[in-house]
Design a protein with these regions (language model features):
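PLP-dependent amino-acid enzyme catalytic core
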Residues: 1-135
């Protein structure tokens, strides 16, 4: 919220705070690895030490599609729904992907009022995992 509020001035602070709290929850980011706490949302793991400093890895793939893109897309879905509701508008989103961007976008917009997503993908050019996420 603190960083977003520096750049988003057309959504009241209390609404923006509520949107970020709705987005970044353990329920949404529930795919933690063994040993990680889902409440951390983006767990920080210490892998070792290099030159006297800890070598750390920030986990960004605990979202619904296991892609780091969930970190932004989930918020974007909630922002779209909020703004469209306030304006009384709807939106159709047309995308094309051969990877996890499409599934992250689809999951982020799933169930959002006034948002429809149409995603194109190349026939036979996606991994089995990516196809399973998309269809």
């Amino acid at each position: 919220f603190e960083i977003l509020s520096l750049y988003i001035d057309d959504i009241p602070a209390e609404d923006l705070r509520a949107l970020t709290r709705k987005t970044y929850t353990a329920e949404v980011y529930c795919n933690a690895r063994a040993g990680d706490n889902t409440a951390d949302i983006t767990p920080l793991r210490t892998l070792g030490e290099e030159g006297g400093a800890p070598l750390q890895l920030l986990g960004l793939s605990n979202g619904p599609t296991l892609a780091f893109k969930d970190m932004a897309m989930q918020l974007l879905g909630n922002l779209f729904e909020y703004v469209l509701d306030k304006r009384g508008q709807s939106i159709n989103i047309l995308g094309a992907t051969s990877g996890d961007t499409g599934s992250a976008a689809e999951y982020a917009m799933r169930g959002k009022h006034n948002v429809k997503v149409f995603m194109l993908s190349p026939d036979g050019k996606m991994s089995a995992f990516q196809r399973a996420q998309m269809y």
